Amino acid sequence: MVRGKVQMRRIENPVHRQVTFCKRRGGLLKKARELSVLCDADVGVIIFSSQGKLHELATNGNMHNLVERYQSNVAGGQMEPGALQRQQVAEQGIFLLREEIDLLQRGLRSTYGGGAGEMTLDKLHALEKGLELWIYQIRTTKMQMMQQEIQFLRNKEGILKEANEMLQEKVKEQQKLYMSLLDLHSQQPTQPMTYGNRFFSI
């Protein structure tokens, strides 16, 4: 039986997507190590998860040295100057991102497990700025959510107020109708009832 072609598309379920990412990432890194060992090749792999977490592999040395080798090989005219400049900017961004991730990870470890004494003064200042930014973003998001909740309650209050006014108008209309019926009944003339020769008025 011929197996049908599997269509590659994004996994919608976040749990299944994360499990598949971990499995495929492990398989990719394993293949990269095997290629390096079997063929004596220098292999570098850089992966960013959907949450922005960095995963990397440099089989010989470190990723920074491998990137420098790559840049030195392509800088000899194989790439256009603009493309090379964009690549350098991207590499610099990756390097800064790695530094920021490392700094924040150290800050989290220091917050929950001690060890802040191992950080330098500059890194502590940078961590403080990062935490202040986080707190500002959290407070901003919190204020936005509170404003949305207040607006929702105001809208709900307005709807209830309108419904109450409509009910009051209906009650007034019913009262007017009832009073009109009473007036109409009171204005009707009394009709005498006879029993033999006697008259009784009602």
Swiss-Prot record:
Coiled coil: none
Superkingdom as given in the UniProt entry: Eukaryota
Entry GO CC: nucleus
Residue ranges of domain MADS-box in the record: 1-61
Name of this chain's protein: MADS-box transcription factor 33
MF (Gene Ontology): DNA-binding transcription factor activity, RNA polymerase II-specific; protein dimerization activity; RNA polymerase II cis-regulatory region sequence-specific DNA binding
Primary location recorded for the protein, binned into one broad class: nucleus
Alphabetic keyword roster: DNA-binding, Nucleus, Transcription, Transcription regulation
SUPFAM superfamilies (alphabetical): SRF-like (SSF55455)
One GO term (biological process): vegetative to reproductive phase transition of meristem
Tissues and organs where the protein is expressed, per its UniProt entry: Expressed in seedling roots.
Subcellular location: Nucleus
PANTHER family xrefs: SERUM RESPONSE FACTOR HOMOLOG
InterPro entries, per database record: MADS-box/MEF2_TF, MEF2-like_N, TF_Kbox, TF_MADSbox, TF_MADSbox_sf
Functional summary from the UniProt entry: Probable transcription factor.
Pfam families: K-box, SRF-TF
Residue intervals of the K-box domain: 87-177
Matching CDD domains: MADS_MEF2_like (cd00265)
